[in-house]
């Protein structure tokens, strides 16, 4: 299966590329969708305001791809920009694929949050969490999505969404490519979800 990893022009994309390739995806890094992919991946690098502006410029193309059955994976910031809006870098509109607002973690904890936290499965309507409940995944973030609709969550001062999904998009606040065996299990589950 073909995956296009969208390059926002910042950060190292090779670890997420390698993680996707390990579970069977043929990955190409590009500034724009290729048009023949099965999956578009929005990586977790950059700031919400700049990245959401860049991705919203492609929203019509994304909608065409969705109608064709293309699936989307957002990692960390890539998940956050799938929500209605975010405050990092000033209030900005997201893609609006999930209801909710992305804001700083509202708690007296050290930020950024860097490290391993446990996953708790909430309600998995997308069959993405087999083998994940109670396992640890790796986070690097200061912002979270404030929403009540999530597949799995973690806790750091507050409970926050770790995995979200709908019929065409999946988002993870954690970095599967940095989450060792648990990350690989998630990416395998995602591969199976795309194949369905």
From Swiss-Prot:
Q: Which domain of life is it from?
A: Archaea
Q: Which UniProt keywords apply?
A: Amino-acid biosynthesis, Cytoplasm, Glutamine amidotransferase, Histidine biosynthesis, Hydrolase, Lyase
Q: Where in the cell is it found?
A: Cytoplasm
What pathway annotation does it carry?
Amino-acid biosynthesis; L-histidine biosynthesis; L-histidine from 5-phospho-alpha-D-ribose 1-diphosphate: step 5/9
Residues of the Glutamine amidotransferase type-1 domain: 2-196
Q: Summarize the protein's role.
A: IGPS catalyzes the conversion of PRFAR and glutamine to IGP, AICAR and glutamate. The HisH subunit catalyzes the hydrolysis of glutamine to glutamate and ammonia as part of the synthesis of IGP and AICAR. The resulting ammonia molecule is channeled to the active site of HisF.
Instruction: List the PANTHER family hit by this protein, alphabetically.
Output: IMIDAZOLE GLYCEROL PHOSPHATE SYNTHASE SUBUNIT HISH
* Protein name according to UniProt: Imidazole glycerol phosphate synthase subunit HisH
